[in-house]
Each structure stands twice: as structure tokens, then as C-alpha cells.
Swiss-Prot record:
Gene3D superfamilies linked: Phosphoenolpyruvate-binding domains
Protein name in UniProt: 2-keto-3-deoxy-L-rhamnonate aldolase
Lineage: Bacteria, Pseudomonadati, Pseudomonadota, Gammaproteobacteria, Enterobacterales
Residues reported to bind Mg(2+): E153, D179
UniProt catalytic activity: 2-dehydro-3-deoxy-L-rhamnonate = (S)-lactaldehyde + pyruvate
Site (Transition state stabilizer): R74
Keywords: Lyase, Magnesium, Metal-binding
Entry GO terms, CC: cytoplasm
Cofactor: record remark: Binds 1 Mg(2+) ion per subunit.
Organism of derivation: Escherichia coli (strain SMS-3-5 / SECEC)
Length: 267
């Protein structure tokens, strides 16, 4: 494979290695580059809940490219045209939100593959992903470097988890704790014992199926628990939350009556 098409994040998942990540919601290439120099294994650049345009995502991919931290792009939705754009700007690993059924998972796989294996539009000659046509035989080899992760974050998705896990082309499944807990009837309470039980069993089912299991845990003890359950790509913080906490802590050192860091149990 051409070295430009290698995907260390995917290779480590295949080996079952644990990878520790950070969620990026700040939407700036400057903050993304700072995060990339910190040594996290992967960085989730969020296009779902953060106000990132396709240009913002592009600039953040450029910013982290010189560093070892591997970027993961989460588009706002699983639209075929948006997935095409995100892949063309050079994303190799995608996290697709709100995948509830095996049919939806198959549609996502198809959107990432060129014909005859899928429906991805052909435009390698004008795409950063193919270095504007300079990567020889890009279309023939790109599938090997693509890593596709889907989010299971509803009761419907849990009911269909085994079928989703059976879809060829899905490399991993990410448990979305905030939406999942709300769907189960425990909004803003991912720490509820029933939610925790379901998270544990889901992670174990994902790993038993030979797929990578992912999670976002802003509380360190929850991150450690998910790792103990077998999750092997875990984000342990969100840049905007860490930044706001650091600001609060510093101000509290100098102004009486100011609160310390906020207690945050979920994203």
C-alpha cells in the first residue's frame, strides 16, 4: 500500500490495541494542532454537535497532519454527499452518528466505497485524499485504509446491535452515552445503574463480534471502567470542557466566592 494511504488508527484497532483519544469541539485548526502535540492516540473532530463547516474540518485535518495523533471525523449525519466530501478532503476514519439498523450501516458502507463496491462519487483528481491525482491507483487501494465506525445510541440500535455488527465494512461501534441514556428513559444520567449495565454488555458484545468498541467518558473513573470492560478506543475528555474547567480553576484561585470546576458526568 502507498504510505500516504496507511491508517495507523485502523491498524491498531485490528491488533486490539487500546487507543486513548480527545474530543475536539472548538472548531479551530489552532486548537486542533495544540491537541495533536499532546500525544493523544486519536482526535475526534466533531461535525455533529460542534459548528464545523466542511472548510473547518479540512483546516483541522491539515493542522494535525504532521503529528502522530490520528484524526477521526464525525459528520453531522450519514448523508452520502457529505460522506463523499469528508473523504475527499482526506479523512480516513469516520464516526457516523445515529446508526440504528443494519440497513443504515450498509448504506454508510456503500457511501464510502467506489463502484462497483459502493456509491462514492469519483473525483480523486481534484481531492486532497488522492493528493490531487498524485497517488497512483488510489481508487484500487483506498478501501484498505478507510476505517468506518458507527454510533449506537438508541434503544432501537441496541435491539439491532448484532445485525449491525454483522455488516461487512464496519470496523467498530461507538456507544453514545448521552443519547443512549436519554433513549432509555434516563436523560442526562449515563451513570444510572441500568444504563451502565447496558453499556457494559454492549461493549462486551461488540468485542466478542471481533469489532472495536469505543466510548466517550469525560469522568476519568468512567473511562477506566469502559477500558476494563474491553473498550479499545476511548475518548477521555472534550477540549472545550477542559478549557472551561481550566479557566474556572484559575479564576477561583484569585477571586473569592468563585466556584471551582464544574462537576460533569456526561457529554
Amino acid at each position: 500500500m502507498n504510505a500516504l494511504l496507511s491508517n495507523p488508527f485502523k491498524e491498531r484497532l485490528r491488533k486490539g490495541e487500546v487507543q486513548i483519544g480527545l474530543w475536539l469541539s472548538s472548531t479551530t485548526s489552532y486548537m486542533a494542532e495544540i491537541a495533536a502535540t499532546s500525544g493523544y492516540d486519536w482526535l475526534l473532530i466533531d461535525g455533529e454537535h460542534a459548528p464545523n463547516t466542511i472548510q473547518d474540518l479540512y483546516h483541522q485535518l491539515q493542522a494535525v497532519a504532521p503529528y502522530a495523533s490520528q484524526p477521526v471525523i464525525r459528520p453531522v449525519e450519514a448523508s452520502k454527499s457529505l460522506i463523499k466530501q469528508v473523504l475527499d478532503i482526506g479523512a480516513q476514519t469516520l464516526l457516523i452518528p445515529m446508526v440504528d439498523t443494519a440497513d443504515q450501516a450498509r448504506q454508510v458502507v456503500s457511501a464510502t466505497r467506489y463502484p462497483p463496491y459502493g456509491e462514492r462519487g469519483v473525483g480523486a483528481s481534484v481531492a486532497r485524499a488522492a493528493r490531487w491525482g498524485r497517488i497512483e491507483n488510489y481508487m484500487a487501494h483506498v478501501n484498505d485504509s478507510l476505517c468506518l465506525l458507527v454510533q449506537v445510541e438508541s434503544k432501537t440500535a441496541l435491539d439491532n446491535l448484532d445485525e449491525i455488527l454483522g455488516v461487512e465494512g464496519i470496523d467498530g461501534v461507538f456507544i453514545g452515552p448521552a443519547d443512549l441514556s436519554a433513549s432509555l428513559g434516563y436523560p442526562d444520567n449515563a451513570g444510572h445503574p441500568e444504563v451502565q449495565r447496558i453499556i457494559e454488555t454492549s461493549i462486551r458484545r461488540i468485542r466478542a463480534a471481533g469489532k472495536a468498541a469505543g466510548f466517550l467518558a469525560v469522568a476519568p473513573d468512567m473511562a477506566q471502567q469502559c477500558l476494563a470492560w474491553g473498550a479499545n478506543f476511548v475518548a477521555v475528555g472534550v477540549d472545550t470542557m477542559l478549557y472551561s474547567d481550566a479557566l474556572d480553576q484559575r479564576l477561583a484561585m484569585f477571586k473569592s466566592g468563585k466556584n471551582g470546576p464544574r462537576v460533569k458526568g456526561s457529554y
